[in-house]
């Protein structure tokens, strides 16, 4: 199974694709879809086209998107929410199952604690996906989201197996 993790952002939308082979995880690719400064509509369109191209190229079986948090900058939060809408729309249009995870849930799944620093997350992603080179911090976060979803799916499969 291939999973694409997405870290929504208006300037940089990180993505990472992993393969889940039983209990093993394998890095396939990661990158960042960029949007240039300017009017919001064209920026969102660029993010959408870029993310759709990644989904077509890698043909994942499932997607995972990090949930956003509200901060003091209401306008910034609103714009980030619109970018998150793109992060949900592109895989939904491709017919993918989408998991959504809070940042603390991603950190807990990857590091073991919900308030881990970015450096700790990147260290554990490198440990879980040996040889990975990050296209940037947003791509590293996206891989962490994909790993979180893989763990969720593996746990769900075990629960189904146990109840059968």
Swiss-Prot record:
Instruction: Report the enzyme's class at the first EC level.
Output: hydrolase
| Cofactor info, note text | Binds 2 Mg(2+) ion per subunit.
User: EC annotation?
Assistant: 3.1.21.10
Q: Which cofactors does the annotated protein need, by name?
A: Mg(2+)
Q: Which Pfam family, an example, fits this chain? A: RuvC
Superkingdom of the source species: Bacteria
Which function does this protein serve?
Answer: The RuvA-RuvB-RuvC complex processes Holliday junction (HJ) DNA during genetic recombination and DNA repair. Endonuclease that resolves HJ intermediates. Cleaves cruciform DNA by making single-stranded nicks across the HJ at symmetrical positions within the homologous arms, yielding a 5'-phosphate and a 3'-hydroxyl group; requires a central core of homology in the junction. The consensus cleavage sequence is 5'-(A/T)TT(C/G)-3'. Cleavage occurs on the 3'-side of the TT dinucleotide at the point of strand exchange.
UniProt GO molecular function: crossover junction DNA endonuclease activity; DNA binding; magnesium ion binding
Q: Where is the active site?
A: 7, 66, 138
Q: Which UniProt keywords apply?
A: Cytoplasm, DNA damage, DNA recombination, DNA repair, DNA-binding, Endonuclease, Hydrolase, Magnesium, Metal-binding, Nuclease
Its name, as the record gives it, is: Crossover junction endodeoxyribonuclease RuvC
Instruction: Indicate where this protein resides in the cell.
Output: Cytoplasm
Reaction equation(s) it catalyzes: Endonucleolytic cleavage at a junction such as a reciprocal single-stranded crossover between two homologous DNA duplexes (Holliday junction)
Instruction: Please tell me the species this chain comes from.
Output: Paracoccus denitrificans (strain Pd 1222)
């Amino acid at each position: 199974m291939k999973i694409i993790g997405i870290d929504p952002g208006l300037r940089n939308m990180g993505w990472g694709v992993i393969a889940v082979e039983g209990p093993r995880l394998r890095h396939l690719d990661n990158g960042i879809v960029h949007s240039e400064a300017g009017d919001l509509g064209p920026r969102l369109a660029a993010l959408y086209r870029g993310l759709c191209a990644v989904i077509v190229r890698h043909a994942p079986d499932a997607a995972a998107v990090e949930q956003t948090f509200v901060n003091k900058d209401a306008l910034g939060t609103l714009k980030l929410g619109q970018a998150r809408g793109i992060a949900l729309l592109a895989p939904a249009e491709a017919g993918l199952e989408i998991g959504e995870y809070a940042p603390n849930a991603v950190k807990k799944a990857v590091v073991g604690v919900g308030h881990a620093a970015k450096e700790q997350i990147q260290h554990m992603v490198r440990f879980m996906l040996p040889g990975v080179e990050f296209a940037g911090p947003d791509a590293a976060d996206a891989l962490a989201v994909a790993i979180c979803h893989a763990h969720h799916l593996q746990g769900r499969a075990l629960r189904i197996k146990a109840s059968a």
